[in-house]
Amino acid sequence: MSDNDELQQIAHLRREYTKGGLRRRDLPADPLTLFERWLSQACDAKLADPTAMVVATVDEHGQPYQRIVLLKHYDEKGMVFYTNLGSRKAHQIENNPRVSLLFPWHTLERQVMVIGKAERLSTLEVMKYFHSRPRDSQIGAWVSKQSSRISARGILESKFLELKQKFQQGEVPLPSFWGGFRVSLEQIEFWQGGEHRLHDRFLYQRENDAWKIDRLAP
């Protein structure tokens, strides 16, 4: 098969969206109510990693970067994730805190996009979550200098065993280079796949203490 033939096959990959639509009359005034409903349905549907979200940032040159992380908490203040503070995404957020999040629930023919500003979590919030993690995950946080270049996986594995021995007694301390961010809720867009590619899109935008809701063309 030639490269052109393979490209033609990819171009014809498609499916119809048949899960149902999203109507304005069914929307709650608060987008978190709809988000919670959709997230609950994603969990009930046994989707793999229903809390997985794409976090998009930009560097100082305007170059976009994306990666998947797990949502760990959400409320009216924003959506929370944790990371190594020496990572590329953390440095980019420090330089430009404007980010977007995307929840891709393909099986349900849905996606949710959040736009807002990321702020560092307090040490108290980070410590509370850190010590709720499995012990090996706590140790793993100490091992990796995230986004740095390494010559072999064995370096990480050896470091993990070394630190597991070091921290075998008592509580694993919180690394100073490990923390989290809360992304404020400025805009939230809900997308539901529709028949004939007539998808339903609704954008919530915060205006003072209320939310403005607009339908967007697909």
Swiss-Prot record:
Binding site for substrate: 14-17, 72, 129, 133, 137, 197-199
Family annotation (NCBIfam families): pdxH, PRK05679.1
Pfam families named in the record: PNP_phzG_C, PNPOx_N
Cofactor info, note text: Binds 1 FMN per subunit.
Taxonomic source organism: Escherichia coli (strain SMS-3-5 / SECEC)
Similarity remark: Belongs to the pyridoxamine 5'-phosphate oxidase family.
One of the GO BP terms on file: pyridoxine biosynthetic process
Superkingdom of origin organism: Bacteria
Identification of the protein by name: Pyridoxine/pyridoxamine 5'-phosphate oxidase
Summary of the function given for this chain in its UniProt record: Catalyzes the oxidation of either pyridoxine 5'-phosphate (PNP) or pyridoxamine 5'-phosphate (PMP) into pyridoxal 5'-phosphate (PLP).
Catalytic activity: pyridoxamine 5'-phosphate + O2 + H2O = pyridoxal 5'-phosphate + H2O2 + NH4(+); pyridoxine 5'-phosphate + O2 = pyridoxal 5'-phosphate + H2O2
